[in-house]
Amino acid sequence: MKTIKKEFVKKTSPYEEKVVKIKRITKVVKGGRRFRFSALVVVGNKKDQIGFATAKAQEIVDAIKKAVEKAKKQLIRIPIVGTTIPHDTIGHFGASKFLLRPASKGTGIVAGGAAARTVLELVGISDVLTKTFGSRTSINVIRAVMDGLKNLRTKEEVAKLRGLTLAKNEQ
């Protein structure tokens, strides 16, 4: 009799995922309370792509899996110059406002909250100055950071939009 050996190779994803928040949510029904879990997950490749999502499920593990899959479908590309961002930007979402400023090499991520720091680490930005204004709820801060990152443009993109050409020393 021939034995068949199967090798299970775990698929390695180029994306790193971090769970920002897990909370138990409750639905009150006629017979009592129904409990589920909600997970907020950020996914990035530490080069230039980032995405986030929330998902709910009966078990924590299932909620995280669902959120990771959703986040991978919503990835966006961010322009990065070296280890920082090309210019100042402000992101808005709801009552949250998030200011991002480029910083010199070696500064690190100066961010007040864990949610914003997670997003910036996973997108691949290692030198940036930030300030959060207004609401500091983790989901609102993440959405404000993402809005700010979406507004970033490189020199080349701005020049093209304005119909200009860059000098050789500016490139």
Curated annotation (Swiss-Prot):
Family classification: Belongs to the universal ribosomal protein uS5 family.
Descriptive protein name: Small ribosomal subunit protein uS5
Pfam families listed in its UniProt record: Ribosomal_S5 (PF00333), Ribosomal_S5_C (PF03719)
Keywords: Ribonucleoprotein, Ribosomal protein, RNA-binding, rRNA-binding
Gene name tied to this protein: rpsE
GO MF: rRNA binding; structural constituent of ribosome
Function: With S4 and S12 plays an important role in translational accuracy.
Domain characteristics, as noted in the entry: The N-terminal domain interacts with the head of the 30S subunit; the C-terminal domain interacts with the body and contacts protein S4. The interaction surface between S4 and S5 is involved in control of translational fidelity.
InterPro entries per record: Ribosomal_Su5_D2-typ_SF, Ribosomal_uS5, Ribosomal_uS5_bac-type, Ribosomal_uS5_C, Ribosomal_uS5_N, Ribsml_uS5_D2-typ_fold_subgr
Lineage: Bacteria, Bacillati, Mycoplasmatota, Mollicutes, Acholeplasmatales
Domain S5 DRBM, first and last residues per copy: 15-78
Gene Ontology BP annotations: translation
Signal sequence extent: none
Subunit-level organization: Part of the 30S ribosomal subunit. Contacts proteins S4 and S8.
Keyword Cell membrane: no
Domain of life of the native organism: Bacteria
Species of provenance: Phytoplasma australiense
GO cellular component: small ribosomal subunit
